[in-house]
């Protein structure tokens, strides 16, 4: 004999409340005030009895589309393409669509997309980088009502789920590799070091601190692109061009260095081409290191030394967190789901290839001679 299907009357008896209260609580009619104790009793009774409102579907089923929104600052960077591939791989496997909001690092666009969230009603939101500081509070409030993950730098404290990266550690790793190879005069090329892009500054600071530890702080040249660049719509070759042009500027200025560190791999590849054009041999004359370990870096003719911080896996993890939070919400009929905060971080790894090497004897002799003359 089949088990009798539970009714709202059964739930009311189990919870010790009226049927009307059961109906209003499970329908989330919170214009009527109920104590947290009453809400939890009704919810627990409904779960124990396996009761569902007639025709009720969970949030995922009640939507025509299962949608996750991704805020991305640019679609021209291989780094962000890797992140998106990781996100979409997980989302598509679970039947979710991904809607990308390309903010182009423009606060006006970011604000516009944030306003649209109430209309779009996605099931989850992923920020591929830190929100603009002007919208941080708004994003934190949004995270109270919808699963939201930020792929960010660890040194900003937040109450939002995050896939973190300590860029200070990454910068230190880049510097330590060059120091261990004997490099003492180096240059760090980077996109604009703006208030919004403070994670870039963290990487630079980590790099400088490692040299400072060896008493070589003044031996690091920081070459940053003009802030106006971040206000332009990025081209496909924006980061490559920045790396090329900043390296050419260093050469034109006659600056002394035996190694160049690029904020990312595309900038480092731009530096490689500039050095090649100037007939400077890599790594015999100048070593080059990047960061991100994108596909191009492993191509045999490039073979760029870089730092791998597992970009695609970060995208996968961010989407996994979103899906877990959605499922967690759907197991509860009210807002009394347990509160959990996810914080995932990978340990970065040095990938030593052919663009870095020990300082040549000629460079060491020149350095010693100049130091003696001083």
Residue ranges and their predicted role:
Residues 11, 22, 362-369:
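Conserved small/polar residues in nucleotide/adenosyl-binding loops
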